[in-house]
Amino acid sequence: METTNKIRAGDVRTASRLIRDLEDRIPGARRKLKDLFVHTGKSFIIGITGSPGAGKSTLADALVHEFRRRSKTVGVLAVDPTSPFTGGAILGDRIRMLRHAEDEGVFVRSLATRGALGGLSQVAGDAIHVMEAMGKDVIIVETVGIGQQELDIVNHAHSVIVVLVPGMGDDIQAMKAGVMEIADVFAVNKADRPGAGQLQTELATLLGTTAIPEGGWIPPVVSLGNLYEPAGFAQQASELAQKVMEHYNHLIVSGRLSGRLERKAMMEITEALRSSILEPVLSRLMSTGELKVMTGRVANRETDPYSEAEAVASRFLKVEGAT
């Protein structure tokens, strides 16, 4: 309970240590998270996704500044599924977050899979819960790309911002089946660049030809211009924060927030099952060398992956109703 009390009091060192232990699958970390869970569920969670180089870190930083201006405490979870957070060019833009380093109302944490078994989504969900238990009013989850893992991660959010930049018009069509469907707010970043008007037109056309989703929310489009014009950029960031808050209020008033919470709970249960069942089985098969043998048999077409999986399941899982 000491860990719980410290985290609830906002102790950054304790929170960082627990997130690291959860990320590294340290024994005992899961029990501490269980104790914290009853103190979660009160934060507003925002997901930010978009192509690499779209300026997501810049927008996340601007939103942190805006929410702090509104006297909200903020947690930021920067997710990198490709490299350990010991440095690297991909983290360059996140250096901007250092301006909040001395602000006790802001807690910034980065995550990486480091090759661990299981989905990155669960690790992100665990970190979100730690930040919730710290009492953060707003939690911003920033992903690096727009792959399936990133889409899974933003499903932990109440509201999702999809960041677009001029020059990626062709990508809008490609993203239809994935990212476009999860957007609650569109942010056209670097809107002072050539092609911004075309991008906004294509986006408006896409939204105009898309059926109004159940619940009646049509994603608004917020344009953000030159970072080096602080006053204008700050005003645009304020508008972005306002639109996201309006979406959250819409979820509450329309009664659709419960659906998002159930979706989030379903994902967490699925990830927890994967962690509790699949990971131990895979670890056992790897340590005994069985997985390598199975892989060889399937690769040589001596058997199929479905039969191998069924055989493993029959060994490790107790079938309901079996005697």
PLM features: what roles do these ranges have?
Residues 2-46, 51-54, 63-149, 156-171:
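Nucleotide-state-sensitive switch-loop elements of NTP-binding domains
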Residues 15, 223-225, 239-317:
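Long, well-ordered amphipathic alpha-helical subdomains in the mid-to-C-terminal portions
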Residues 23, 37, 41, 64-68, ...:
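Signal for well-folded cores of large energy- and translation-related assemblies
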Residues 59:
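Hydrophobic positions on the alpha1 helix immediately C-terminal to the Walker A/P-loop
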Residues 90, 127, 152, 156, ...:
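Alpha-helical scaffold elements adjacent to nucleotide-binding pockets in ATP/GTP-utilizing enzyme cores
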Residues 110-111, 162-165, 187-190, 223-225:
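Conserved beta-strand segments of the P-loop GTPase G domain that flank and frequently precede/overlap
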Residues 153, 166-194:
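Flexible active-site lid/hinge loop adjacent to a nucleotide/diphosphate
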Residues 185, 191-251:
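Canonical P-loop GTPase G-domain recognition
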